[in-house]
């Protein structure tokens, strides 16, 4: 309903929250391409990602770890005509709140469009754009295809002993390949395992989650 189509690039800059998972899976399901930014990236990096990928949308939290992402998103809107901004939390002027997207049910026409988009996804097409380490300059975009990334997650999960009893605790950023698909959350989901998202790197919180959720794998 928001006009995001197959092969559209969307810069995704969210912390380790359920909304990251919702956005990532929704985008790849219809053949749109998430460009994964890390929470520490600021104007210079985000501008580069939008320009290099040709992104049509940018997804951010309102405030995370004492930083308000909305003014930065507003600046990007001023620099890139037509850029849509979606905010998890309270949206700023000219931005769309994530919660507003969840109101009501999609009508029959939208449902048909979604199903058609899902059916048309080419396994050999780009599914995700990861970032290089950026040790010598701004990070480069690394395209990963649907078939490549599913195989990557499946084989890494097999090597890691993932199965339906796996309870995977995510601590490192989901925007990294490691915790996304090596084997990451995709490896856990592939075998029907459980994913637990740590809200911080606080040691006491981590140990509490390990005990409470009976965690079997940490990354």
Q: Residue spans of the language-model regions?
A:
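A short helix-loop-beta submotif of the ANL/AMP-binding
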Residues: 9, 15-35, 39-43, 51-58, ...
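Structural core segment of the AMP-binding/adenylate-forming
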Residues: 2, 30-103
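Conserved pre-ATP/AMP-binding loop-to-beta segment of ANL
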Residues: 87, 92-93, 105-131, 138, ...
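Conserved S/T- and glycine-rich ATP-binding loop of Class I adenylate-forming
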Residues: 10, 27, 126, 131-135, ...
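Adenylate-forming
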Residues: 60-72, 172, 201-202, 215-219
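Conserved AMP-binding/adenylate-forming core of the ANL superfamily
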Residues: 1-25, 42-47, 99-106, 144-147
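Short hydrophobic/charged patches on amphipathic alpha-helices used for structural packing
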Residues: 46-47, 118, 204-207
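Conserved AMP-binding/adenylation subdomain of ANL enzymes
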Residues: 31, 150-167, 177-217
């Amino acid at each position: 309903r928001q006009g995001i189509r197959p092969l559209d690039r969307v810069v995704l800059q969210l912390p380790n929250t359920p909304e990251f998972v919702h956005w990532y899976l929704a985008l790849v399901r219809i053949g749109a391409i998430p460009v994964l930014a890390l929470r520490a990236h600021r104007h210079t990096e985000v501008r580069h990602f939008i320009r290099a990928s040709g992104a049509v949308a940018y997804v951010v939290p309102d405030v995370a770890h004492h930083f308000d992402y909305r003014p930065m998103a507003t600046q990007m809107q001023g620099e890139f005509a037509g850029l849509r901004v979606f905010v998890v939390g309270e949206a700023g002027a000219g931005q769309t709140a994530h919660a507003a997207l969840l109101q009501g049910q999609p009508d029959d026409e939208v449902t048909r469009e979604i199903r058609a988009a899902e059916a048309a996804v080419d396994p050999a097409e780009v599914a995700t754009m990861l970032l290089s380490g950026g040790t010598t300059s701004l990070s480069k975009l690394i395209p990963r295809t649907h078939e490549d990334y599913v195989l990557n997650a499946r084989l890494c999960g097999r090597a890691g002993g993932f199965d339906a009893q796996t309870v995977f605790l995510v601590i490192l950023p989901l925007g990294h390949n490691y915790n996304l698909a090596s084997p990451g959350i995709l490896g856990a989901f592939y075998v029907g395992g459980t994913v637990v998202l740590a809200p911080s790197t606080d040691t006491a919180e981590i140990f509490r989650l390990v005990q409470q959720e009976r965690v079997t794998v940490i990354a």
